[in-house]
Amino acid sequence: MNLSIQGELQLFAEELHQHLTPSFLENLARELTFVKRKRKFSGHDLAIICVWVSQRVASDSLVRLCSQLHAVTGTLMSPEGLNKRFNKKAVCFLKHIFSTLLKNKICETSLIPSSSITYFQRIRILDATIFQVPKHLANVYPGSGGCAQTAGIKIQLEYDLHSGQFLNFQVEPGKNNDKTFGTECLATLRPGDLCIRDLGYYSLDDLDQMDQRGVYYISRLKLNNMVYIKNEFPEYFRNGIVKKQSQYIKVDLEHIMNTLKPGQVHEITEAYIGKDKKLFTRVIIYRLTEKQLRERKKKQVYTESKKGITYSEKSKRLAGMNIYVTNTPLEWVPMEQIHDFYSLRWQIEIIFKTWKSLFQIHDWQNIKRERLECHIYGKLIAIFLCSSTMFKMRQLILQKKKRELSEYKAIGMIQDHLYILYQAIQQNTQEITRILIRLFHLLQKNGRKSHRYEKKTVFDILGVVYEYTGLIKQKKIA
């Protein structure tokens, strides 16, 4: 085994071990008064049942959960006794563990080298996933409305594509507005960051704030927003003052769309957006391909029937294009690459897909609130551990083998090893390192990302140098 890989994984093992040992969990349980005196059900037992062993805390029967706990620890509980342990203090305990792991910034050392990092220190991707919860929780977690969405939980996540670090995170009611959380995330911005936002987070004020702070953005523009260019020959009053309504000329976006061929791009380099307060920006218009347009129309039909929304005729006509706004310099990200860069946002959808398809975070029976929340935070701890491990392995496999790791495949394989990782944590960091080395060998053999014909991967877009089918691939930003 390469000593540098072993050394890297040893440091990573120490980070994992620090906040998950039985002694740490027991001390935390007493500190948070989840456990007041020595009793048969400990904080460590709660972590076992919610994080390490059971994948179905919210859907398996209490009898089954008791059986799983007894099989691993020998702790004998009645179903009624276990149900009582799913209380507010148990939720607080698991939530505290998750928050501690987030603050620990385990992924800060998992940075991948790329040409994009020359320009953008962090590529911040923000999105949310939502799922329904039992209807009797509608007063605590009101849903987003629409078909059968009386109660729901929304999980907001912003993470850095370069390192995998979770930057901002929030569990909230399904009805909460995405834009509000997007504005809250401004507090953690640093000069040199690149924020990629979808329409749900669109805010002209937020984009203006980013620009003022030396932060770059790529965002979709809502179709009801106006785009202007400066009028070179404005009208004046007799006293020499410019008539405000003549300072700018409205751009006919539909006309531009109709002049473009499918897949073609057009840029307005010196544009202004906003009706009253105008923001100077680049505007890029991308005409959708026939396939993309069919998919969008299909989605519109689904949205109209599912959420009771009716699109105007103008919106349906303009559905044939994407309009992007960005303050990135033209020489860093040419207009031909804006659509590719914006597509990086879909990486967060892969993460959310693992949450539901692999971890079943959205799977529940008609249970009480505290048990559901224990399920959610237990899953989030497991998800964070698997994601952090995946991003570390992604970095090492690129660094040592020049290969691109599939995030989805890797998280599934790491999840399969979660229980033996738990067993290693009960011992020492050397044992954790041994398991991580096993995982490294497995992932480099079976975890390579599949490439579709003429489809760029994340590494291609970011300008990462890696090997694929015997060739070295390198895509540069400019």
From Swiss-Prot:
Key words of the record: DNA recombination, DNA-binding, Transposable element, Transposition
GO molecular function, one term: transposase activity
Keyword DNA-binding belongs to the record: yes
Classification via SUPFAM superfamilies: Ribonuclease H-like
Any one Pfam family match given in the protein's UniProt record, by short name: DDE_Tnp_1
Membrane spanning residue stretches: none
GO biological process, one term: DNA transposition
Domain of life: Bacteria
InterPro entries for this protein: RNaseH-like_sf, Transpos_IS4, Transposase_11
Function, as annotated: Involved in the transposition of the insertion sequence.
Family the entry assigns: Belongs to the transposase 11 family.
Protein name: Transposase for insertion sequence element IS231E
Species of origin: Bacillus thuringiensis subsp. finitimus
